[in-house]
Amino acid sequence: MRVLCAFPEAMPSSNSRPPACLAPGALYLALLLHLSLSSQAGDRRPLPVDRAAGLKEKTLILLDVSTKNPVRTVNENFLSLQLDPSIIHDGWLDFLSSKRLVTLARGLSPAFLRFGGKRTDFLQFQNLRNPAKSRGGPGPDYYLKNYEDDIVRSDVALDKQKGCKIAQHPDVMLELQREKAAQMHLVLLKEQFSNTYSNLILTARSLDKLYNFADCSGLHLIFALNALRRNPNNSWNSSSALSLLKYSASKKYNISWELGNEPNNYRTMHGRAVNGSQLGKDYIQLKSLLQPIRIYSRASLYGPNIGRPRKNVIALLDGFMKVAGSTVDAVTWQHCYIDGRVVKVMDFLKTRLLDTLSDQIRKIQKVVNTYTPGKKIWLEGVVTTSAGGTNNLSDSYAAGFLWLNTLGMLANQGIDVVIRHSFFDHGYNHLVDQNFNPLPDYWLSLLYKRLIGPKVLAVHVAGLQRKPRPGRVIRDKLRIYAHCTNHHNHNYVRGSITLFIINLHRSRKKIKLAGTLRDKLVHQYLLQPYGQEGLKSKSVQLNGQPLVMVDDGTLPELKPRPLRAGRTLVIPPVTMGFYVVKNVNALACRYR
């Protein structure tokens, strides 16, 4: 629940509405404020704070959570992942068998893995019996790919739980691949800026590798089929898709399906527009292809994966929902926050930017609920910055403020699943870099997965608030969300609550737990940048300890810092953290 708190920043806005602040029982909370003043000094360690902000620190924020009933319940796979088809182009698909990559992906399971992106509609499936012959003879790619195949055959480690194919790739081989990927990155960027894309061939062998990665990692694969293959009458040409469906069914691959990616852009990408009504008919056609295939007769189908809901996009969604609203299991759209070519580090701290998503959610919900009230809605392919992201920004600690706020806002407004673009690929919006090292948003996602359950709780705060002048709105720089603690986390009994807090202020903030949370033990998971780069750092520390993998097969233990019962929470400036309130015995959290 997004909340207003002490001395937020006033910013001009002509179109924004004031964010809601829930504070029932204000008299009760005011009494608690009076009784709790003696505990303000719970943490006396000096922190670097501007002298001008000294008065702000005297404000104590009282926080309570409604524990009787959840306000929302989202999907168990709420935080999910995406892989872009560009990994075929740059060669990284052949390295999905990496033990380190599989370990990192397993850390974020259970989740969906969407295989889709801008190159979805240029993807063609070929069931080649001998892929080596299709490579055109010896060359750098030939030797690199066959070297990888040899390693997989000779050095496969069979996972004891699944019997997965997992490989240890030699350093020299990874270095060759990085050089190739760096060259291809320039090609991919050129395609993206010119909006002209070359065709991609997905072989049966490549599909095997993709599915092996998803299955070994505990991820459910969602495959986005090419929707731009069109017949002369503009109906969908399903021949390539049918070949892929038959092959995957023969392998008994458990896959869900989509058709296309951002159909609102087809005119500029392909010179041929597809309206919402036609796209709806195409989805019905895809459903008719799936039903006779025994393993896919009840497979889930998602779409239409539209872009930002501008007027023309809303019109496309409206036409789609009229025809195929009941055909899809969830309605999907995409969101990008910033133009990656002009982004600055301070952009990630702007409350106006954090709030742009809320209006889009309402627009999508309005159309969906008109035709299929209660239909699940997913945000697919969310990225912080466009154009592949910006080095040292999109992959830095600073980008985490947008990502964590996105997770909190979406769950609070009833979006069922959010799919992060991307787990691993070219560019800088990913969770894992090309050295297979987890970036700050990965660690943030890992903490979220470990601590946050699907039940969303209402947050109530009390504290001094400044009234906005006419024509202006106060935007909150302290954001607090609450969920039931993940019931799969055996370190905490059912009934515990997890708060996650974003402090965008340049001063620390003090929060006193009240009501049902009062005098409970708290475990702190404070995530801060590590190193001299500050907000631009690509490394993070948890409660003062840097987070790094133990080895290729082992993630580090996420150790909390216990806080004594009744202690005031002190949130350092420009940081984010998770706080597990133990043994609350919250009724909303006792049962699944």
UniProtKB/Swiss-Prot annotation:
Subcellular location: Secreted, Extracellular space, Extracellular matrix
GO BP of this protein: cell population proliferation; extracellular matrix organization; positive regulation of cell population proliferation
Lineage: superkingdom: Eukaryota
UniProt-annotated glycosylation sites, renumbered to this chain: 254, 392
Tissues with expression: Widely expressed, with the highest expression in brain, mammary gland, prostate, small intestine, testis and uterus. In the central nervous system, expressed in the spinal cord, caudate nucleus, thalamus, substantia nigra, medulla oblongata, putamen and pons. In the urinary bladder, expressed in longitudinal and circular layers of detrusor muscle. Found both in normal and cancer tissues.
One Pfam family per UniProt: Glyco_hydro_79n
Main location: secreted
InterPro entries recorded: Glyco_hydro_79, Glycoside_hydrolase_SF
GO cellular component terms attached to this protein's record: extracellular matrix; extracellular space; plasma membrane
Keyword terms, alphabetized: Extracellular matrix, Glycoprotein, Secreted, Signal
Statement: the UniProt record of this protein carries the keyword Signal: yes
Signal peptide as annotated in the record: 1-41
One Gene Ontology term of the molecular function aspect: heparan sulfate proteoglycan binding
Assembly and oligomerization: Interacts with HPSE. Interacts with SDC1 (via glycan chains).
Disease implicated: Urofacial syndrome 1: A rare autosomal recessive disorder characterized by facial grimacing when attempting to smile and failure of the urinary bladder to void completely despite a lack of anatomical bladder outflow obstruction or overt neurological damage. Affected individuals often have reflux of infected urine from the bladder to the upper renal tract, with a risk of kidney damage and renal failure.
Family listed: Belongs to the glycosyl hydrolase 79 family.
Function: Binds heparin and heparan sulfate with high affinity, but lacks heparanase activity. Inhibits HPSE, possibly by competing for its substrates (in vitro).
The name this protein goes by in its record: Inactive heparanase-2
Organism: Homo sapiens
